[in-house]
């Protein structure tokens, strides 16, 4: 079995997350021109990894992307947006499959690929400002998701949070996207992306694996 995030012990994964957060904070502190640091993990070749070894990447950017800027403006108009359109809606649709005192995990919707979402419940929505218990709560659910999906599923782990220059509430959340299909000509021409696993089926797959 390949050494993926899911094959770590919970403690190892927590330290891995902590190390990533420390690097994230350090980049902001060491370069005043950085406006956003994107954090991601590509697992296996189909998900963009050059080598099949575990690693996270942090990229400093001197601006906020158009997509993120639009999302932040939506959150400014509706401060409860992430509850209305994500966590609460997932609850109404019975898509939540794991929760602890500090975070909640659910089968997400609206993505090109089957996606698991893990949202922090912490009031402070920058990872480096959260308590060790809050970080561990996030880490435990992210680790559980990786363990449930196994090491043979190519995926992208993407981090989202409030950058220092933004003054609105953006909860720290992590998306794990299963890169199990390859968009081709149909998707390019129609802009219709066929997702072969619906959120409820994805939820059931993960729940079954968590019980094993």
Go through the PLM ranges and name each one.
Residues 1-212:
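HIT superfamily nucleotide-processing domains
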């Amino acid at each position: 079995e390949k050494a993926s995030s899911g094959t770590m012990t919970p403690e190892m994964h927590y330290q891995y997350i902590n190390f990533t957060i420390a690097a994230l904070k350090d980049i902001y502190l060491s370069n005043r021109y950085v406006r956003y640091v994107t954090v991601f993990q590509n697992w296996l070749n189909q998900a963009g990894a050059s080598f099949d070894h575990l690693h996270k990447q942090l990229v400093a950017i001197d601006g906020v992307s158009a997509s993120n800027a639009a999302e932040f403006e939506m959150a400014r108009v509706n401060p409860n947006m992430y509850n209305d359109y994500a966590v609460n809606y997932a609850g109404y649709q019975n898509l939540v499959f794991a929760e602890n005192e500090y975070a909640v995990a659910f089968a997400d919707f609206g993505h090109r690929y089957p996606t698991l979402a893990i949202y922090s419940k912490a009031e402070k929505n920058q990872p480096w400002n959260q308590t060790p218990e809050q970080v561990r709560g996030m880490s435990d659910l992210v680790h559980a998701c990786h363990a449930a999906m196994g090491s043979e599923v190519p995926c992208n782990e993407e981090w989202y949070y409030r950058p220092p220059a933004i003054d609105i509430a953006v909860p720290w959340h992590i998306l794990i996207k299963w890169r199990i299909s390859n968009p081709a000509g149909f998707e390019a021409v129609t802009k219709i992306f066929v997702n072969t696993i619906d959120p409820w089926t994805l939820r059931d797959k993960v729940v079954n694996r968590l019980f094993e």
